[in-house]
Amino acid sequence: MGCSECCVRCLGGVPYASLIATILCFVGVALFCGCGHEALTGTEKLIELYFSNDFMDYALLVNVIQVFQYIIYGTASFSFLYGVLLLAEGFYTTSAVKALFGEFRTTVCGRCVSATFIFLTYALGVTWMGVFAFSALPVYIYYTMWSTCQMVKYVTENGTGFDDICVDARQYGILPWNASPGKICGLSLAAVCNTSEFELTYHLFIATFAGAAATVIALLTYMMSSTYNYAVLKFLSRDDCCTKF
């Protein structure tokens, strides 16, 4: 067997769908965890500097942010390990196995492992869909605030109704209704709109949302490829076929 033929056979056994899904999963989780962590920190800073004069008003929010940040640490570690395991399982069920070990023979244990990965990937996919939907909430809040900032710039140019434009963090449940001041208007709002912290935090939440979307797509790709491979292992292993998905 020549070197070129060997390379062709090796490339033919690569689970490209699983490989692409692994890369997409790593990128998505990295975006979600890294940007989400910094966005939460930026949110805490904005609340502290502009929306509340008393720490007790946002003490619960600080605790919630810390809990989410710890969850992010665990999510990053678990997703990296699970992505590697899924990629290894994809390689196991490709033509590379048949090329190395001859006729495709699978054990009951091997099929059970594949079925387990399908179930876990499905459960994780549903969970990440919920995370994806939840991560849209801060994007909506910051988009509303950004839209108000654009209105402030327009009103500033016209010079009327400047002090009537406000952003109230209490209406989103971020702060209790007895928080003081809880909202910012006029010059204070314009000052916040011009800060780099606000722009950075807004874009970080957008990146977090995009990372969650990428992770959902990766898990759906994993699920399709794992289901296809399992079908081949269970029903078509007696035929002269192999998986390349």
Swiss-Prot record:
Keyword terms, alphabetized: Membrane, Transmembrane, Transmembrane helix
GO cellular component term, pick one: plasma membrane
Family to which the UniProt record says this protein belongs: Belongs to the myelin proteolipid protein family.
Annotated GO MF terms: structural constituent of myelin sheath
Sections of the chain in a coiled coil: none
Tissues expressing this chain: Highly expressed in white matter in myelinating shark brain.
Localization of this protein: Membrane
Cross-referenced InterPro entries: Myelin_PLP, Myelin_PLP_CS
Species of origin: Squalus acanthias (Spiny dogfish)
PANTHER family associated with the record: DMALPHA1 (PTHR11683:SF17), MYELIN PROTEOLIPID (PTHR11683)
SMART domains linked: PLP
GO BP annotations listed: axon development; central nervous system myelination
Taxon lineage: Eukaryota, Metazoa, Chordata, Craniata, Vertebrata
Record-given protein name: Proteolipid protein DM alpha
Residue ranges crossing the lipid bilayer per the database entry: 19-35, 71-87, 117-133, 204-220
Membrane topology of the entry: Multi-pass membrane protein
